[in-house]
Amino acid sequence: MLTLYGTELSSRLLLGTARYPSPAILAEAVRRSKTEIVTVSLRRETAGGKAGGAFFELIRDLGVRVLPNTAGCHSVKEAALTAKMAREVFRTNWIKLELIGHQDTLQPDVFQLVEAARILTEDGFEVFPYTTEDLVVGEHLLGAGCKVLMPWCAPIGSAMGPQNIPGLRAMRAEFPDLPLIVDAGIGRPSHAATVMELGFDAVLLNTAVASAADPAAMAEAFANAIDAGHGGYLAGLLEPRDMAVPSTPVIGKGVFA
């Protein structure tokens, strides 16, 4: 089981809700992924007026837990205001905290991120911070009250997959008992399996599913890959070797002079 802020979950896949071809396809993707948490951008959906209301109704009908985010925010003040609005709309203290520092890479502004996390935690929020794999930043986020970290593995929407596996591995080693969710940059089910094999607890996806030729089928493929990667990690993966090692035993074989 995955436990996030005291909530036990069976699925290790968190699914974003943006950019799907239609609400019906989104709903089918959520169902086939078996996710229990979807992320929602309050800023985008409230701007949709009546369409936004229909979207919220769809999410409620799916029976999944909502993790609102502060996507598009560039300042502590902006993120805090968005988080408070999300709490009123969705009636949850959960917030995925995003504070973008660079427009081209969508890299998080980790300095403002720590400040915002502290402010929101003190206001009763349970913060899921979108961050980098930097260990020092991670320590500061824990000091600010976060009990989950969400490091990227590549820029948002890039589909490049994990770009710094040693850094991700170091993060897992540094925070062995903390829930770590890889967020951003996953493009293929194999990418998701790779980070789960490193010992990460879950993966958050959006573009890789929503922009697929068949989003619902891709959601199911990712769910299977995540389960496979996690299962492999628990089973104990064979470490790579520089030289060959015979897999066939030689005991009992005849010796020819």
From Swiss-Prot:
Source organism superkingdom: Bacteria
Binding site for 1-deoxy-D-xylulose 5-phosphate: 157, 184-185, 206-207
Active site: 96
A GO cellular component annotation in the UniProt record: cytoplasm
Enzyme Commission no: 2.8.1.10
Classification via InterPro entries: Aldolase_TIM (IPR013785), Thiazole_synthase_ThiG (IPR033983), ThiG (IPR008867)
Principal location: cytoplasm
One Pfam family hit: ThiG
Gene3D superfamilies according to UniProt: Aldolase class I
Gene Ontology terms describing biological process: thiamine diphosphate biosynthetic process
Reactions this protein catalyses: [ThiS sulfur-carrier protein]-C-terminal-Gly-aminoethanethioate + 2-iminoacetate + 1-deoxy-D-xylulose 5-phosphate = [ThiS sulfur-carrier protein]-C-terminal Gly-Gly + 2-[(2R,5Z)-2-carboxy-4-methylthiazol-5(2H)-ylidene]ethyl phosphate + 2 H2O + H(+)
Alphabetic keyword roster: Cytoplasm, Schiff base, Thiamine biosynthesis, Transferase
A GO term, aspect molecular function: thiazole synthase activity
Cellular localisation: Cytoplasm
UniProt pathway annotation: Cofactor biosynthesis; thiamine diphosphate biosynthesis
Statement: the UniProt record of this protein carries the keyword S-adenosyl-L-methionine: no
Subunit relationships: Homotetramer. Forms heterodimers with either ThiH or ThiS.
Protein purpose: Catalyzes the rearrangement of 1-deoxy-D-xylulose 5-phosphate (DXP) to produce the thiazole phosphate moiety of thiamine. Sulfur is provided by the thiocarboxylate moiety of the carrier protein ThiS. In vitro, sulfur can be provided by H(2)S.
Family recorded in the similarity comment: Belongs to the ThiG family.
Protein name in UniProt: Thiazole synthase
Organism of derivation: Allorhizobium ampelinum (strain ATCC BAA-846 / DSM 112012 / S4)
Underlying gene: thiG
